[in-house]
């Protein structure tokens, strides 16, 4: 669970600014109506139910609105997710030796061997098969992400 403690003062100040953009009437909380207004101004078109779901996800005290501490928790969570995506992208680059956007059986075998994992050709092929959703014999970035998310 991400917490506000993981945020810097600078980030908190930025989020306070963003919060005030949402909090149109300045009462210290964001309603579904205010959330809808901001999202529509950003070109999104959420339904009332979607807006309510978004609020319910972070509405810790159950009052139907998002206050600033709840908003901070939501932003801290989002930032943690982004770190994870970045880590997965970096890991993919390690495997994708030739940088063509795919991990071949040979590349996978090379990395696993260099990590001290002595795998048989069958084991490497099996790993590729499990992750290779479109059946082209190699693993693309999207397939790699799905595999990493399932494992974590």
From Swiss-Prot:
One of its GO terms (biological process) is protein export from nucleus. Ca(2+) 2 binds at residues 59, 61, 63, 65, 70. Ca(2+) 3 binds at residues 96, 98, 100, 102, 107. Ca(2+) 4 binds at residues 132, 134, 136, 138, 143. Residues 10-45, 46-81, 83-118, 119-152 form the EF-hand domain. PROSITE patterns: EF_HAND_1, EF_HAND_2. Its main location: other. Interacts with cmbB, numA/nucleomorphin, pgkA/phosphoglycerate kinase, and thyB/thymidine kinase in the presence of Ca(2+). Interacts with dwwA in the absence of Ca(2+). Calmodulin mediates the control of a large number of enzymes, ion channels and other proteins by Ca(2+). Among the enzymes to be stimulated by the calmodulin-Ca(2+) complex are a number of protein kinases and phosphatases. Belongs to the calmodulin family. This is Calmodulin. It comes from Dictyostelium discoideum (Social amoeba).
């Amino acid at each position: 669970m991400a917490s506000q403690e993981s945020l810097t003062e600078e980030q908190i100040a930025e989020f306070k600014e963003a919060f005030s953009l949402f909090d149109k009437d300045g009462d210290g909380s964001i309603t579904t109506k205010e959330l809808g207004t901001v999202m529509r101004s950003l070109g999104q078109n959420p339904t009332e139910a979607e807006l309510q779901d978004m609020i319910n996800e972070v509405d810790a005290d159950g009052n139907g609105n998002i206050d600033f501490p709840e908003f901070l928790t939501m932003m801290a969570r989002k930032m943690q997710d982004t770190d994870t995506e970045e880590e997965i992208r970096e890991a993919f680059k390690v495997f994708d030796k030739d940088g063509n956007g795919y991990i071949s059986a040979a590349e996978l075998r090379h990395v696993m061997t260099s990590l001290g994992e002595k795998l048989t050709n069958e084991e490497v092929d099996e790993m590729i098969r499990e992750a290779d959703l479109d059946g082209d014999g190699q693993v693309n970035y999207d397939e790699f992400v799905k595999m990493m998310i399932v494992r974590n």
